[in-house]
Amino acid sequence: MNPAHLLVLAAVCVSLLGASSVPPRPLNLINFQRMIQCTTRRSAWDFTNYGCYCGAGGSGTPVDELDRCCKVHDDCYGAAEKYHRCSPKLTLYTSTCSSQTGSVTCKDNGTKCKAFVCNCDRTAALCFGRAPYNKNNENINPNRCR
């Protein structure tokens, strides 16, 4: 085999091995991230470890209005799974953002699941836009969430 071909094959194998250790990002979270940035003008990463409910999981009593937005969003995703038999984190939909007004619109997505999930994300993103962001509630002690 040609040495150049071997080099390319080795590079592909190494890149695949490296990629296998990176967990795939749920596709819908990209849509939700865009909505959050539209309504808050903040990075969606600002909300990944906020309070008791923003980010993965959630328990206890929400620490403030923004954290309540996240709990409502979690509950909405639960309803999507239960009543619409869909996987919200994997459901792709179409929406538009007006960066001038901070408004988000869900487009006709063709299925009840897509429409429901888009509305879950839209409602949460608008709630994030209205709620104050308190830096003291970033990376809080998990004991506060019991």
From Swiss-Prot:
Residues 1-21 form the signal peptide. Pfam families: Phospholip_A2_1. The keyword Signal applies. One of its GO terms (cellular component) is extracellular region. Belongs to the phospholipase A2 family. Group I subfamily. D49 sub-subfamily. Glycans are attached at residue 109. It catalyses: a 1,2-diacyl-sn-glycero-3-phosphocholine + H2O = a 1-acyl-sn-glycero-3-phosphocholine + a fatty acid + H(+). Disulfide bonds join 38-97, 52-145, 54-70, 69-127, 76-120, 86-113, 106-118. PLA2 catalyzes the calcium-dependent hydrolysis of the 2-acyl groups in 3-sn-phosphoglycerides. PROSITE patterns: PA2_ASP, PA2_HIS. It comes from Micrurus corallinus (Brazilian coral snake). Its cofactor is Ca(2+). Its EC number is 3.1.1.4. InterPro entries: PLipase_A2 (IPR001211), PLipase_A2_Asp_AS (IPR033112), PLipase_A2_dom (IPR016090), PLipase_A2_dom_sf (IPR036444), PLipase_A2_His_AS (IPR033113). It comes from the Eukaryota. Keywords: Calcium, Disulfide bond, Glycoprotein, Hydrolase, Lipid degradation, Lipid metabolism, Metal-binding, Secreted, Signal, Toxin. It is found in: Secreted. The active site is at residues 73, 121. Residues 22-27 form a propeptide. One of its GO terms (molecular function) is calcium ion binding. SUPFAM superfamilies: Phospholipase A2, PLA2 (SSF48619). Its main location: secreted. Ca(2+) binds at residues 53, 55, 57, 74. Expressed by the venom gland. GO terms for biological process: arachidonate secretion; lipid catabolic process; phospholipid metabolic process. This is Basic phospholipase A2. PANTHER family: PHOSPHOLIPASE A2 (PTHR11716:SF94), PHOSPHOLIPASE A2 FAMILY MEMBER (PTHR11716).
